[in-house]
Amino acid sequence: MEQRAYYSIREVTEMICNDRVLVLTALDETLSQLPTGNWIGGIANQNEVTYNEEGEPLLIQVNDLSQWVRSVHINSYQSFNFESIEKDAFTNGFSIITIPAFSSVHLSFAIYSATTPNWQHPVIGWIAGSECGTPKMRESVVVDGGTGEFYVERVVVMHCALYDNYKAWYDIINPFEPDLSKPRFKFPNASFNISECSVLENSAVEEGVKNDILNNTTELRTAFKPYADAHDIAIDAETTLITQLHGEYTTVSILMNLTGKSLILATPVIPGLSYYIGKRYLNEEDLFTVNADSVIFSVNCFYVPKPSPRSIASYGEVARFIYNHVAVRLHVSHSLDTIFGSKPQTAT
């Protein structure tokens, strides 16, 4: 069967029955028609429907990982056992995670990933949702294809063991950096909804400083939106807030600009962290060709060009932390290539 991005229910059913290892996105009523097997899935936006030669609608986005994976096990997790994600992973492998958008477990995972040590193996995935921030928004669900269970308050992870001669790694293509000419912000609560904030205005901007508290800093408590409006800070879907976690820039985008003083974010802010306004410093498409031959799976924000036709467009990109406005890519290479060859170029 030809490799393409979307397949019919019949075609995907055949793949599952042939023990293919699959990552799927579609509407929930479509995913509910599939048999159990080696797959995980998440709800997605409704795309324009195309048809195969048999006239069947191509409703399911498919990423087939069978070529590299010798075995899998699929688990679901709640906030009290996130630490088991690392424990359940294969020694030589990777894990694909999907999280229901704007659920309490989405919030909990954002906090957990920001406050725990680095994981020792690749975990990447996506925040699954459908028409989020619009009147057509559906309840966010993720699916454990091994059992057929649909979850609105659990994350689902497919742990994949690689064949012995392969190694997995990932990179993050992040086209944003902090705008040091603008103030920093702190928020009092871990939340998708922001209104009040503390503004940290520096009397002098120091080049190269990332998320450290500068000397001569004054703090102003105010409403975020009126402050942004008064200081010509754009508030729209492409506005990015940036903080630093374990030496890495992570990004948060605005999903909805509500009437009044509130904003709804695609990823929650974390109290105690300082957030900058982001500015674009490169064209992410320029990096898509770097190590492109080893990419087997990718996730991208709706506002980022797709690295490949099969890349999952998401409401959040997961690669250790949760990001917005980036692309994350999972690579598999022969072991010697990973050890002695070129390393991934990560733009962060």
Q: For each of these PLM feature ranges, what is it?
A:
Residues 1-348:
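Hydrophobic alpha/beta core scaffold segments
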